[in-house]
Each structure stands twice: as structure tokens, then as C-alpha cells.
């Protein structure tokens, strides 16, 4: 449900902009006509083939892999009373002109000094979406500077950023109630409390990578999934929620994986091969085989029945879906890896105190060369289906731990491909080895 950074792919001027897909509430509610093939958003979809073509053009834009972006998300707390419920007025005051319009409708929503855009989630979590860069070093510099700017603004208002992937102090509480968030809360409430936990009490780190060329697509798509379980375990950072230990290394991923599996879980068969026949077809099929979470009507949001989006196209009842409906549906698909014209890796917990660079560097190193990525995927096949064990047990799961060790060692060997300076590289290596050999989480606990 979070917003991805500015698209990390460089495309020729004729390419359709990757950010036409609305992801956040503000973009979903203000999206104008679709720009894909000049199809007006209000055009009815009467043929599943047309929908499939649209999904392909929106979600898979191929080209040389060059750029990387991150989204950094945190829970927000009062510095001296971290368990105190957050007042949205205090958060809006702290953010000033950087506040999104979902929080302050009259805000200019200015970017931070180095270009990062601030958004706010339903529970008051704050996130920075970075501009894409062709250099991990540049990304580290600009994102770190924007984090400092954000931290200073919050500090002046008596607020601070959280350090884990779940709110360790407070139960989930929705403080933003626009149309999209209200509809999403109602839809997920039909399946229990996990929706509220996800919307209002979690914080993640998203790393966005180019899809790659047509030739690279299958490898990069498969690798993004196959690396998931060991990286979840290696960077698990949410063992506590609302004042109690949950028994999960990553309570955040436990919530996501079980929330609405057709929409949020990993692919049913992640071991279908390092080179799946057609990731575009697989994703398109999943989108069309998933029911809409909610539908936007002139009279307000409507919660539909169990019919899938593909069935809605075929029946055309109570009205045919439009491309605006399909855009909205795509924005409510929340799998661990989401194609948005680039690959959005969504399975990492928020990291504390600038340590987001560690998982970002690992992924950048592994994805820098196809040969490295092939080696990486070949070492993790035994753990490929262990999403839930990775989230629950972290590095205490021996199969996942073995895969994590292999990935970390390979990444350390290939960090030179990231262009990071020696000092940062040394920091990354030390952090990885500390977690692997001491089995420690960033918050200092052990498993």
C-alpha cells in the first residue's frame, strides 16, 4: 500500500512513464486519465486480452538495468512518550511544507532538500521516496541527507522515528481517514485484525531495481522472489508489536504474508524454476485472478463480492470495469515483489539508524551482474518456499540461515560492483557478519 520511489529505470522519451500506476492514497484519488496508449481512464474493458496488454505495458518496462531507488518508512513516536498515540496535527506541524496533502490538504508537498518526497500512512508512519539514481553511492548520500532533514524537523516538534518494522509500543490506530484508506480498512476488516496491523503499525524498506532487458527479465524476476526468504531472515527487525513479543522475527512480514494471500502472499510456486517461462503472463494471470479489494463509484467506494477482476470483465456486471478500475486494482496488489515498470522488492523490514544501506547494498551487489545473480539463485533454492519460516524463525531456521550465509558472503565478495566507497563497504560487511555470526537483530535481541 505504500508508494514506490520515483521509477528507477531510465527509458527513452517515447516510453510510457512508469508512475502512472497509483499506489498511495493521494495518487489513487487524484489520478487523471491513463496515458498508456492514449486510453482514457473511463474506457470500459470488455476483453481480457486488452486488460492483459495494459498490464504488460504498465508493469513491465524493459531496458538496460541502471538505476536504483529506495523507500524508507518508519513509525513515528513522541520522543519522551513513545507509547502515546500520535496526534496528526503534531505530525503535520512537524513536517511543515513537506506534509502530504492527505495530512494537510493545503500543503505544497515540497520535496526534501535532496528530492525525497514524504508521504504518510494511515497510522502516521512517515516514508521518504527517493529519486532514482544510477549510483548507489549517490543514493546513499541523498537519502541519508534527506533522513537527517526529516529527523531534525521531527526532533524540533518532540517527535522521533521508530527503529523497527512494527510499532513496538502502541496498538494500531488509524489517524488518516481519506476515502481510499477508509475503503481499504473496511475491506481488510472482513478478514480480521491483520489489515489494521498492516495499515497502521508496520514500517518497511523497499528497494526498487530496474526490470532489465527482455533477455534479463526472467532471471531478475525469479531472483527477486528466490532471494526473499533468506533476506527476510537476515534483516528481520520486528519481533515486538504493541508492547509484547510476538514470537516472530519479522512480525511485519507475518502480517503481509497471511493478510490476504491471493493479494499479498508470495507466488504459490516460487520454485517453478530460475527461468520461468513467462513472468509477464504469470503476473497478468495473478492480477486478473484476484478479486478487486474495493471499487470506486460516483457515490463512494463499493466493497465487491468474491468475483475476480477477470470475471468482472467477462460478466460486465453490475457495470463493465474501466481502465481506472484496473489502475486501482493494480494499486491494491501487495505481493512481496511487485512489478511497476521496475521491480519493487517489498519484503524487508525497516532498519534503524541508517542501516538501510546494508540490505540495499546486498541487493545492488547481487543484481549488478547476471552471473552473480545466477550464482545467488542457485544457492538459495532449498529456501525458496520458506517465506513463513523465515519470517517466524529468522536465522534460527537452518535452511534459511544457510541460504542467508551464502548470499551474504557472495554479496560481500561483489560489493566492489556497487561503487560504494571503502568506508561504506566496510560498514556493510561488518553489519552483515555481525548479524550472521551472532544472530542478532538490529534492535539488539537474539534468537
Regions found by a protein language model. Name each.
Residues 128, 286, 344-346:
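Short, aliphatic-rich beta-strand segments
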Residues 162-333, 337-338:
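Loop-rich catalytic cores of soluble enzymes, especially ATP-dependent carboxylate-amine ligases
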Residues 130, 209-211, 347-349:
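Short glycine-centered, acidic/aromatic-flanked micro-motifs in structured strand/loop junctions
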Residues 2-11, 19-24, 32-193, 201, ...:
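Terminal catalytic/cofactor-binding subdomain
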Residues 75, 206-208, 344-346:
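Structured core elements
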Residues 304-385:
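Long, well-ordered mid-to-C-terminal structural blocks that present hydrophobic/aromatic surfaces
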Amino acid at each position: 500500500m505504500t508508494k514506490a520511489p520515483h521509477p528507477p529505470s531510465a527509458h527513452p522519451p517515447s516510453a510510457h512513464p512508469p508512475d502512472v500506476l497509483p499506489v498511495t492514497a493521494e495518487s489513487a484519488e487524484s489520478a487523471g486519465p491513463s496515458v498508456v496508449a492514449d486510453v482514457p481512464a473511463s474506457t470500459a474493458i470488455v476483453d481480457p486480452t486488452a486488460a492483459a496488454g495494459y498490464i504488460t505495458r504498465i508493469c513491465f518496462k524493459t531496458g538496460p538495468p541502471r538505476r536504483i531507488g529506495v523507500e524508507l518508512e518508519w513509525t513515528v513516536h513522541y520522543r519522551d512518550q513513545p507509547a502515546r498515540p500520535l496526534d496528526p496535527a503534531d505530525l503535520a506541524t512537524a513536517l511543515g511544507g513537506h506534509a502530504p496533502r492527505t495530512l494537510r490538504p493545503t500543503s505544497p508537498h515540497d520535496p526534501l532538500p535532496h528530492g525525497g518526497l514524504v508521504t504518510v500512512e494511515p497510522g502516521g508512519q512517515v516514508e521518504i521516496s527517493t529519486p532514482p539514481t544510477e549510483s548507489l553511492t549517490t543514493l546513499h548520500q541523498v537519502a541519508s541527507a534527506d533522513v537527517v532533514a526529516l529527523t531534525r524537523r521531527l526532533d524540533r516538534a518532540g517527535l522521533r522515528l521508530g527503529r523497527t518494522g512494527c510499532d513496538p509500543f502502541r496498538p494500531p490506530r488509524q489517524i488518516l481517514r481519506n476515502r481510499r484508506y477508509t475503503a481499504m480498512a473496511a475491506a481488510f476488516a472482513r478478514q480480521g485484525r491483520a489489515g489494521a496491523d498492516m495499515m497502521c503499525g508496520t514500517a518497511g524498506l523497499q528497494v526498487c531495481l530496474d526490470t532489465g532487458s527482455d533477455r534479463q527479465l526472467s532471471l531478475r524476476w525469479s531472483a527477486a522472489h528466490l532471494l526473499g526468504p533468506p533476506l527476510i531472515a537476515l534483516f528481520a527487525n520486528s519481533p515486538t508489536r504493541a508492547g509484547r513479543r510476538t514470537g516472530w522475527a519479522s512480525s511485519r512480514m507475518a502480517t503481509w504474508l497471511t493478510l490476504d494471500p491471493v493479494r499479498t502472499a508470495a507466488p504459490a510456486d516460487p520454485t517453478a524454476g530460475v527461468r520461468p517461462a513467462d513472468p509477464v503472463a504469470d503476473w497478468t494471470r495473478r492480477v486478473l485472478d484476484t478479486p478487486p479489494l474495493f471499487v470506486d463509484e460516483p457515490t463512494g467506494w463499493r466493497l465487491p463480492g468474491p468475483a475476480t477482476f477477470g470475471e468482472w470483465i467477462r460478466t460486465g456486471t453490475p457495470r463493465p470495469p474501466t481502465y481506472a478500475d484496473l489502475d486501482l486494482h493494480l494499486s491494491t496488489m501487495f505481493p512481496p515483489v511487485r512489478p511497476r515498470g521496475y521491480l519493487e522488492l517489498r519484503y524487508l523490514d525497516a532498519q534503524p539508524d541508517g542501516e538501510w544501506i546494508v540490505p540495499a547494498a546486498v541487493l545492488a551487489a547481487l543484481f549488478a551482474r547476471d552471473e552473480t545473480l545466477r550464482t545467488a539463485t542457485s544457492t538459495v533454492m532449498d529456501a525458496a518456499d520458506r517465506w513463513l519460516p523465515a519470517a517466524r524463525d529468522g536465522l534460527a531456521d537452518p535452511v534459511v540461515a544457510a541460504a542467508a550465509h551464502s548470499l551474504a558472503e557472495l554479496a560481500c565478495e561483489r560489493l566492489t560492483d556497487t561503487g560504494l566507497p571503502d568506508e561504506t563497504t566496510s560498514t556493510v560487511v561488518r553489519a552483515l557478519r555481525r548479524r550472521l555470526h551472532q544472530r542478532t537483530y538490529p534492535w539488539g535481541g537474539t534468537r
